[in-house]
Amino acid sequence: MSDINATRLPIFWFIYFPCVSDVDSTLTRGER
């Protein structure tokens, strides 16, 4: 099970992190 998590986690971050930074920049633009 740990092997599956080790391979899935990087993929999850590659998909999740850009979405978070995209929303973050949108919120920052909205405040300014």
Curated annotation (Swiss-Prot):
Processed by the macrocyclase-peptidase enzyme POPB to yield a toxic cyclic octapeptide. POPB first removes 10 residues from the N-terminus. Conformational trapping of the remaining peptide forces the enzyme to release this intermediate rather than proceed to macrocyclization. The enzyme rebinds the remaining peptide in a different conformation and catalyzes macrocyclization of the N-terminal 8 residues. The keyword Endoplasmic reticulum does not apply. InterPro entries: Amanitin/phalloidin. Expressed in basidiocarps. Keywords: Toxin. One of its GO terms (molecular function) is toxin activity. It comes from the Eukaryota. Belongs to the MSDIN fungal toxin family. Probable toxin that belongs to the MSDIN-like toxin family responsible for a large number of food poisoning cases and deaths. This is MSDIN-like toxin proprotein 1.
